Structures are given as structure tokens and as C-alpha cells.
Amino acid sequence: MNRFDDIATWLRSSPGRVRVSGSGSRAHTLPKITDATPLHLSQYNRIERLDAGDQTCTVECGVPRAELDAALAEHELELPCLGGGTIGGLFATDPFGPAAAGCPGPRNLLLGMEALLASGSAFKSGARVFKSVAGFDVHKLFVGSTGRLFVATKLHLRLKPRPRTEQWFANRALERDQALQLIHALRQEAQAEEPPPLDKE
């Protein structure tokens, strides 16, 4: 039996509107709805697959971001976008966009998904690995939709190697051109650093 069959059955029998939630970390950003039935997904929190070689993974919608980050760190990988809460909620709200200039946005990190419509009907879109898929990328519509279109149950994600170092800065007094010059200088400085020597066996 599919772990999400109970949700599909509930959706088929539930009248009216449904409010989907994970950890509830972004509930304050949504408009209040008094006549919606809550659907909590935080218990669906398995990391189903992590392929370090292909730099992809499959997770259930309720996996906490912190737990996924910890699992990826063991393989020197990361999900290069900002935000916490659950993975399903992170992609449904897309609160921050790309983590930095030149990084892929959440839409580009979402390779595919399994999902449920409000009627309880299940469907799949995209793929588990990074490759061309014929047809319309329905799963891309999930990013930023706040769960209005369908419920994502599993997400197939594209990963990236973790950077060797990170450098953050903030300065409200900088003008745009000054900020761009500083970013350019920091990148040149990082590129000039010698990589650590490889261990010889």
C-alpha cells in the first residue's frame, strides 16, 4: 500500500477547501481561512533515495530541511537554495529564490514529483534524474504555488557539491555599483586561493 493512499482517500471524501501544511513555519505568511480543513504532512518525512554519484535525491514532502542538509553534508553535497521548514513547504512557497547570483533557482532544482490533485487522483511529472523529459513540466508549477494546485507527496531534487568555503557580507551603505565591484573582488580572491593538496595514498 502506498504511504499516501490515506491522503488520496481523505481528499476524495473531504468536501470544501483544504489548507495544506508541513511544519507550519510559514503559516503566518498566508491569508487566514476559517472554512478550510487542515491537511498536515509533516509525518511524511522519509529521505527515500540519495544518489551521490548522480547528485540527485528523492524525498517525501515532510522532510525537514535541516535533516536533508545533514544527510547531504555526509556526501559533501547541498541543496543550493535558502529557506527552512519542510522540503515540500520550501518549494511550495519559494520564499527566497536562488541562494546567490549564478545559482539555480528552486524551479531548476526540482527534477520531478509525485503529487495528488484535490480530487485524490495521483499523478507524476518529470523524472528522478537530470535529463530531458518530453511534454510540459507540470511539476514546475508547484514552485511558489503555496499548494493551491495540488499536493506534492514526493520530490525529486537536483543537488550540487558543497563549496569548500563560504563568505557572507552585508553593508547597507553600498550603492549598487559598489556592491557589484565588491562581489567581483571577492570572487577573484576566492579563485586566486590555491586548492588544498590531495592526499596521496
What are the roles of these predicted feature ranges?
Residues I33, A99-A100, R158:
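Single-residue recognition of alpha-helix boundary sites
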Residues W10, A71, L90, L182-A185:
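Residues that form generic nucleotide/phosphate-binding pockets
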Residues A92, L110-E201:
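C-terminal substrate-binding/cap subdomain adjacent to the FAD-binding core in PCMH-type
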Residues M1-V20, H40-G83, D94-R128, P163-N171:
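N-terminal glycine-rich flavin-associated loop
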Residues G85-G89:
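Acidic low-complexity segments
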